[in-house]
Amino acid sequence: MALSIGIVGLPNVGKSTLFNALTKAQNAQAANYPFCTIEPNKATVPVPDRRIDALVDLVHPQKTINATVDFIDIAGLVRGASKGEGLGNQFLGNIRECAAILEVVRCFEDDDITHVDGSVDPLRDIETIETELLLADIQGTSKRHERMVKMSKGDKDARVAADEMARLLEHLNNGNPASTFEAKDCPAFAAAWHELGLLTAKKIIYCANVDEDSL
């Protein structure tokens, strides 16, 4: 199964341009207006590996299959996405399917390219996205905790899992990402954690989109 990486960021920061560059394709429309991308663009890219190349030279197999990465170009996120603003739930659902997040951040000035918040501020943009991911995790965890509490009556293991979910919810409410939560050994909680697909538990790679003079 290929590793899936979701390309995310605010509208008009260069996500689709990066997607086209990574996949050597022009499948994703890149335009100077918000929500140019609505449905996610997807492409599978083979991963170069010199070790495989060396083995191919030695063995001369009939067929060579490299590891692959699935890149997914996801619609732009805006402040309030966790409450349904912009493409809201659709955007967050698309991210949930990815194993890792590639966050594109605009770091260049250009009066001809609009910024959804009116000015270029990379740190503010990162905070906006990570806040929305955290709020979405809080919502999902809160709902799951409520269900687990109802199911825990008379079931010791379920009660332990519900208590652990409460600890996770407190952790998130304190502004901490799920990736820093230290869970106790509890199979029922581990299963619930996996089903939640917490956004702040995913690895994040930051991509700074700079002007040519900064390269």
Language model regions located:
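Conserved G1/Walker A P-loop phosphate-binding module
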Residues: 1-112, 141-143, 147
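Conserved Switch II/interswitch segment of TRAFAC-class P-loop GTPases
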Residues: 43-48, 75-85, 96-158, 171-185, ...
